[in-house]
Design a protein with these regions (language model features):
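Ribonuclease/tRNase effector modules and their secretory precursors
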Residues: 1-119
Length: 119
């Protein structure tokens, strides 16, 4: 998986790093610890969410590059991606659901931007 140039341009991210890695086992353990049980079923859809998100954004609370991918299924799923400068890649830090209110709020304040893979 890769952080595409199209998403970098949309979000004004300046880095040559593009590879996105994740360990399904470690991510599942993290999700269970954080009580993200409702998003566990989406682990098999990570490629789809990252390759074709409905919305993308940058987490303003993180000092380093942190990208958010959102896919609207029955429940809205957010995949948080963080940069690992030492290893020269990005990694999936967390996966969880966000409710419609929070999704709309993030769109309204422009934290999330609509993404169309075909544009």
């Amino acid at each position: 998986m890769k952080l595409t140039n199209k998403i970098k341009e949309l979000l004004c991210i300046k880095t040559d790093i593009e590879d996105i890695l994740f360990s399904k086992k470690a991510l599942k353990k993290h999700m269970l610890k954080r009580n993200h049980h409702d998003a566990l079923k989406c682990l098999d859809n990570l490629d789809e969410i990252i390759e074709s998100p409905d919305y993308v954004g940058v987490n303003p609370r993180e000092q380093a590059i942190s990208v958010e991918y959102v896919k609207c299924y029955e429940n809205n799923v957010l995949v948080a991606i963080k940069i690992n400068i030492d290893n020269n890649n990005f990694y999936v830090a967390s996966v969880y659901t966000i409710d419609e209110y929070k999704l709309n709020k993030h769109i309204r304040i422009k934290r999330l931007k609509k993404f169309d893979k075909n544009e």
